[in-house]
């Protein structure tokens, strides 16, 4: 229903553009023929304005109310530029292009999922456990993984979440995850789990599997944009920011997150464990477990401006210290395991740290994040996991 309304709105806006162009030509011709008597011409002009206004507002309201991809940015640009002659036409054409592409893209996805519904290509032998990264939580109504879990479930996946705190040391987060794994296996009798972990969650998961006795409950561990070798820029920042400032920020964060459900958040411990020096120590002791399949997914932005705030600001800093990156984690640091996947798209866009968890619910030309995870999980199924 939403896509149909959005598509109808785009069609009305296209009709508006074409009919407006033809109406201008018509009014010019009739004005020339009726000169100097403009009485009839005024009637024609009023009729055109009324009809075009009806078509335009009918279309733009439908698009504004149903498009998910326009976002605040293009809605604001559309409103602001609506009062600027000629510029408003370019803005309107951009709005039509974005909304039309969304309609076509989502309609094709619906058709694909419908055709393969009976195949259950994501029905893995063992359920999926999603593990979030630092400074986020698993909220019921605001999914950390965006539209990805719903897409996987439609294709047969059984999904659980880590439900651990937003910020803690790798050791403490690992303990929470180990407890969660035992809980899921004990309650469901599923035997094992396939972990998919993002960012610091990958370090937490590696520690839990290697050090906390849950290796027999884990079939595979897929890390996504995880800084396995740390972030050198984090070492630099921690060395430059005064201790008083670090403690002030940590106190404010810890206090705020307790109100959101964290029992014992530790901002500084979480940040310290992301440094290159800490990750080196981790890698010396946290070894891969034979019998557990390890793989990684990494991505990179192509230019800083293609990342959403704050990744567009952090990208140059990370690039200076660590090389090509996703806005936070370098591609060299994200690789781990038997299968190392590196992602980007052509042009200036690239794929950011947030894009790989569908943080902004944005459709990216050349990369379908939901389908990527469908194929990733399908691969786990085909491997017997």
How does the language model describe each region?
Residues 41-46, 74-80, 288-385:
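C-terminal catalytic-base region of ester-bond hydrolases, centering on the histidine
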Residues 145-148, 211-214, 238-241, 313, ...:
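Glycine-rich, phosphate-binding/catalytic loops in enzymes
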């Amino acid at each position: 229903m939403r896509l149909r309304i959005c598509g109808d709105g785009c069609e009305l806006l296209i009709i508006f553009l074409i009919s407006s162009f033809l109406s201008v030509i018509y009014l010019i011709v009739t004005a020339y023929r009726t000169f100097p008597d403009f009485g009839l011409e005024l009637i024609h002009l009023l009729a055109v304005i009324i009809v075009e206004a009806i078509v335009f507002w009918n279309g733009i309201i439908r698009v504004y109310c149903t498009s998910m991809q326009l976002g605040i940015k293009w809605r604001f640009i559309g409103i602001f530029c609506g009062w600027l002659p000629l510029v408003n036409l370019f803005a309107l054409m951009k709005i039509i292009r974005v909304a039309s592409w969304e309609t076509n893209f989502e309609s094709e996805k619906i058709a694909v999922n419908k055709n393969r519904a009976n195949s259950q290509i994501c029905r893995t032998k063992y359920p999926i456990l999603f593990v979030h990264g630092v400074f986020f939580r698993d909220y019921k109504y605001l999914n950390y993984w965006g539209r990805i879990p719903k897409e996987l479930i439609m294709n047969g996946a059984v999904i659980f979440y880590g439900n651990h705190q937003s910020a803690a040391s790798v050791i403490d987060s690992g303990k929470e995850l180990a407890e969660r794994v035992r809980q899921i296996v004990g309650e469901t009798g599923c035997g094992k789990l396939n972990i998919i972990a993002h960012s610091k969650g990958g370090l937490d998961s590696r520690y839990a599997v290697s050090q906390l006795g849950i290796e027999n409950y884990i079939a595979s561990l897929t890390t996504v944009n995880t800084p396995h070798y740390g972030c050198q820029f984090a070492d630099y920042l921690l060395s430059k920011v005064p201790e008083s400032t670090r403690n002030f920020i940590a106190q404010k964060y810890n206090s705020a997150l307790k109100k959101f459900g964290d029992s014992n958040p530790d901002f500084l411990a979480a940040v310290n464990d992301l440094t290159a020096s800490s990750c080196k120590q981790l890698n010396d002791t946290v070894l891969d477990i034979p019998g557990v399949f390890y793989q990684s997914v990494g991505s990179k932005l192509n230019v800083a401006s293609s990342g959403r705030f704050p990744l567009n600001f952090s990208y140059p800093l990370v690039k200076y210290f660590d090389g090509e990156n996703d806005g936070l984690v370098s591609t060299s640091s994200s690789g781990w395991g038997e299968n190392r996947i590196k992602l980007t798209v052509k042009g200036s866009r690239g794929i950011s740290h947030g894009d790989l968890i569908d943080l902004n619910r944005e459709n990216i030309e050349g990369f379908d994040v939901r389908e990527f995870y469908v194929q990733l999980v399908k691969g786990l199924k085909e491997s017997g996991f």
